[in-house]
Amino acid sequence: MSEVESREKEPDAGLSPDIVQATLPFLSSDDIKNLSQTNKYYNTLLDFDHSKILWHELFHKAFGTLKTNDEPFQGRNSAEFKTCTETILREAFPTLSWQEVYQLRAYDAKFYSWGYLKHGRLGYTASSNNELVATSLNGPSPRFKYGVNTPTEVPWFNSRTTSRTSNFTPSEDPLSAIKKDGDEIIAQVSSGGFSFQILTESGNLYSSGSTFSGGLKGPGPSGSQHDYNPFREMIHNMERSYPRITSRSNGSTVNTTGTFSGRRMSGSHPSTAYEPGNATTAQHITIDSGGAPAASPGGSHSGVPRTTMPSMGPHENIYSQIEMLERSANKAVPGNNHIRRMFARNSFPLYSGRDENLGSFNDIQFVAVSSGRSHFLAMDTDNNIYSWDSTESDQGVKIEFANLPSRATNPILKIASGWNFNCCYIYKVGLVAWKERDAIQKGESFAFAKYEIVPNTNDVNGDSRIVDFACLQDNCVFFINNNGDKLWKYHNGLNQIVDLNIVGKLCKINACFASLVLFTDTHCYTLKVTNGDVDKDSLTELDINENVISVASGDYHTVALTERGHLYSWGIESQDCGCLGLGPSEKIVNELHIGNWEGQRNIRVVKPTKIELPEDYICVSVTAGGWQTGALIIKKH
């Protein structure tokens, strides 16, 4: 066969280019790579060196946050679909290829944070981050600081991803090289009330600070229920296996797992430590007022020799195995103990109640994360979702929905977290919200959510098809549909229309504790919200002379991101925390005259004010929660 005849035959070796392009959004990057290696036809069609379509789709998958409500579904009123990040990067780097844009986002985007310092929530403390300068810290004295008032880079992995800047050797396959570096490439950052959640390109999930809950209950077990805790059970069983010593003088008991000022107790197993000649297990040992041991009433032996009593030094650490297991579940970023990796309970067979392979580990990979006030929700590569919602554990709980269709036919398309509840959009089911779940019992691998289905949100093609949704508190959900002419609110089992005097078709919404942001195809508006009730009189068009494409809100402050990669902030900076990122408090009030004191340490900035980044720096993603703000920032070369 001639070369010409061969080329003519090649299209018969696979699907047409249009069909392949249409299927790319439904394939993982590994699937696409494998498909490209199937034969010459697919290898040419999916050319990793020259295909714009391929790298554009790979960019969406890696950095588009398509599985959370950070980005809306593509609606009838949407133009060509673009994520916020790609809009900014195409504006800033119009001449780069999609492969170059992908590599720029992967290697040059660094995580910056600012705001309240308490509990290391920013990913660092005042003394642990070398990037901090004195003028960036708010506080009454050099030794006592409240917060960080300017965007500051967070200490992250210090390996070749820091210096590589997307330069590959001629022999390297760029996608494979990026995959190798995936553990250190930040794909998404989400902010809760007391921490940031950081998702890497490889699917690892991290959380900043010492607590994501702040000691507050999230949408976890109902009432006073508690999840099964294997660590607590192991400790209880270990301590029970040691005998207790009863004093004849006052009848008090002492657990022998404590430390004694004497010889280490004899025997290598707790059940034989006080048994002469391997007798049956001693349950109680009685000590008279002089300290001499005597047989416990009803005991099987007449006395315990004095040599079996501890007489010097503490016994061996009976908790060593538990401590080893806990250490395996607490992995920090190298060189930064203020950012820890987060795992699901299902990663550890220990939680199943089985004794075998206690140290084994199942590495679950996540593709999306969304944060609430004291909890967060993540989705894995198999379309399972996990909720970190308890003050008692740092491990996520797998969530299931009783009496709903299988994920195989009705997958979860997006996840979201409100102030005190979780929500997701399930194909042909609609919006599903819950603020409680069952407690996990021993041997169980998941918990059932106590959910509500938002009525009339299951349409997948028509006018009522959901385009975007936003979560407030107590299962209150705002949403918009394909028509784009109405804002809907679901609360207490009912859907209501919120009538507003706005211009344009609604295409995107954002909400937090006390605010609601509406995007139309021509304008951007803000509204105040109190206990789910919209203050219609507070409707305000954003006064920013740039096109705003993303907005994030904390408790009382808001940050906007424009298509040019600029940041603007306004609202209340509580307790001198620095969350607005506009500099020292005195400068905001006395020099720039853009804010006013409210009380002793609160500052209000009414008009959106530009956050000054270093020259040639742009922001590609912003998040906020509580009293802190975070952003992914790139230096333009």
Curated annotation (Swiss-Prot):
Bias (Polar residues) ranges: 244-260
A Pfam match: RCC1_2
UniProt keyword DNA-binding, yes or no: no
GO biological process: protein ubiquitination; SCF-dependent proteasomal ubiquitin-dependent protein catabolic process; ubiquitin-dependent protein catabolic process
RCC1 repeat start and end residues: 109-202, 565-635
Biased composition annotated in UniProt, kind: Low complexity: 289-305
Coiled coil, from the record: none
UniProt pathway: Protein modification; protein ubiquitination
Name of the protein: SCF-associated factor 1
